[in-house]
């Protein structure tokens, strides 16, 4: 099983931030969830109240996608026609994309083509420089450090990062897991901690903007802030200075599950 992280920044003019989040969750997400080979899909919408704290979100959100293997990305299966993927029983989704012929004839357009057209009017895909802060794309395998239970109401922080110049990928991943991971596991109030290590073979398949990402869960923003002022957080941050390039991409959110076909929910 592989995971893909895709950062999200809203289109600069098409919607307010509130409208962006609503459309992403109610239209674009369910549309992409029709992709047959997609096993699981979770959206993360950065919380408005988190922008005044630390860590502060740098993105409006992020999506995570689960696929069976890297072969799905290497050799994507043919995409179904839109009117085969989205049916009348899908009601609102059908009327929005199929009934309206929103991006073209639904009998000719594929689901993938429709998703991409919808993507362009929802997210910031402008080529204006600087580009670094706009892009977050990582193909990885997860390594669970703290295997605790979570609930939908918990706060989740995602950090996406690149290794410090001079570190080979294997050196970076070894220290991240064996040293940094153990430091992170000691954070007060932490319920679950997952590292996601980029796959070396994936770099040749699609461009990756970072070398990995971490996911960490707390009960609420107050618990996160209490953890941030702890000696354990200071030790983690000090080690991070030897490991990561800065700034990182950051999302502070709650999980919104759009699709889940995996047994046990993880």
Q: Where are the language model's segments positioned?
A:
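Macromolecular interaction modules
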Residues: 1-266
């Amino acid at each position: 099983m592989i995971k893909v992280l895709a950062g999200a920044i809203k289109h600069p003019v098409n919607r307010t931030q509130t409208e962006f989040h609503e459309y992403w969750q109610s239209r674009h997400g369910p549309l992409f969830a029709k992709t047959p080979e997609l096993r699981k899909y979770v959206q993360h919408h950065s919380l408005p109240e988190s922008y005044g704290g630390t860590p502060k979100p740098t993105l409006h959100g992020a999506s995570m996608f689960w696929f069976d293997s890297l072969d799905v990305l290497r050799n994507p299966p043919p995409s179904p026609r839109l009117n085969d993927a989205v049916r009348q029983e899908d009601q609102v989704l059908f009327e929005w994309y199929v009934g309206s012929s929103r991006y073209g004839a639904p009998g000719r357009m594929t689901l993938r083509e429709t998703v991409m057209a919808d993507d362009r009017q929802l997210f910031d895909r402008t080529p204006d420089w600087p580009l670094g802060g706009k892009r977050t794309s990582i193909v990885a395998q997860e390594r669970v450090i703290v295997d605790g239970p979570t609930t939908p109401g918990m706060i989740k922080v995602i950090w996406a990062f690149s290794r410090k110049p001079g570190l080979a990928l294997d050196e970076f991943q070894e220290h991240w897991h064996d040293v940094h991971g153990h430091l992170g596991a000691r954070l007060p109030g932490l319920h679950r901690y997952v590292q996601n290590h980029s796959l070396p073979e994936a770099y040749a398949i699609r461009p990756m903007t970072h070398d990995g990402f971490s996911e960490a869960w707390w009960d609420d923003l107050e618990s996160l802030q209490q953890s941030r002022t702890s000696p354990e957080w200071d030790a983690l941050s000090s080690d991070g200075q030897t490991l990561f390039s800065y700034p990182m991409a950051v999302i502070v959110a709650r999980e919104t599950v759009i699709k889940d076909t995996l047994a046990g929910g993880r």
